[in-house]
Swiss-Prot record:
It comes from the Eukaryota. Component of the small nucleolar ribonucleoprotein particle containing H/ACA-type snoRNAs (H/ACA snoRNPs). SUPFAM superfamilies: L30e-like (SSF55315). Belongs to the eukaryotic ribosomal protein eL8 family. The gene is NHP2. The keyword rRNA processing applies. One of its GO terms (molecular function) is RNA binding. Keywords: Nucleus, Ribonucleoprotein, Ribosome biogenesis, RNA-binding, rRNA processing. One of its GO terms (cellular component) is nucleolus. It comes from Drosophila yakuba (Fruit fly). Pfam families: Ribosomal_L7Ae. This is H/ACA ribonucleoprotein complex subunit 2-like protein.
Length: 160
C-alpha cells in the first residue's frame, strides 16, 4: 500500500468539489423543511416565530443553566417543576419517543411549539448535532424577547 501525497493548489476548493469528495448542501427553505414534519407536530411555529425562537435560544445559550436541551433533560426538568418555554423539533423519528411531552406541557401550563428542523435547533445552540427538545427559562438579560415569544406561543392554537 502506498501513501498518496496531496498537493494543495490555489484552486484547491474547486478541485475538491469537482472530484466529488465534498458535497455542498444548499440551505433548505422553511417550506422545504415542512415536508419532513411529523403529523403530531402541532402547533407549528411560523417562519417569523421560528426565527425569534432561534434567536432566543442563542441568547439563552450564553447562560448554561437557563437552557435545557435534549429529551431526557427536558423531561426531567418538566417533571421537577421548572417553567419556561418548550421548543420541539417537528422532524423527529420515531415519534413515540417524544409524543407525550406536549401533554406534559399542557398539564403544567407551559407554552410550547414545534419548529420544522432539529438541525436548526442544534445550530441555534451553536452545536453541530441537532436536538429534539429545548426548555428555555427566563433571564433578565433577554426578558423582552422571552416575553414576546411566550406571548406569541400562548396565542397559537393548541390542537384538541
Amino acid at each position: 500500500m502506498v501513501k498518496v501525497k496531496v498537493e494543495r493548489s490555489e484552486d484547491a476548493d474547486e478541485s475538491v468539489v469537482a472530484s466529488g469528495d465534498v458535497t455542498i448542501k444548499e440551505e433548505e427553505s422553511y417550506d422545504d423543511k415542512l415536508i419532513f414534519v411529523n403529523a403530531i407536530a402541532k402547533p407549528m411555529a411560523g417562519k417569523k416565530l421560528a426565527k425569534k425562537c432561534y434567536k432566543l435560544v442563542k441568547k439563552a445559550m450564553k447562560h448554561k443553566t437557563f437552557l435545557r436541551n435534549g429529551l431526557k433533560d427536558v423531561q426531567t426538568r418538566l417533571r421537577k417543576g421548572e417553567t419556561g418555554i418548550c421548543i420541539f423539533a417537528g422532524d423527529v423519528t420515531p415519534v413515540d419517543i417524544m409524543c407525550h411531552l406536549p401533554a406534559v406541557c399542557e398539564e403544567k401550563g407551559i407554552p410550547y411549539a414545534y419548529t420544522p428542523s432539529r438541525a436548526d435547533l442544534g445550530a441555534a445552540m451553536g452545536v453541530k448535532r441537532g436536538t429534539v427538545a429545548l426548555l428555555v427559562r427566563q433571564n433578565d438579560e433577554y426578558k423582552d424577547l422571552y416575553d414576546e415569544v411566550k406571548e406569541e406561543l400562548s396565542a397559537l392554537n393548541i390542537p384538541v
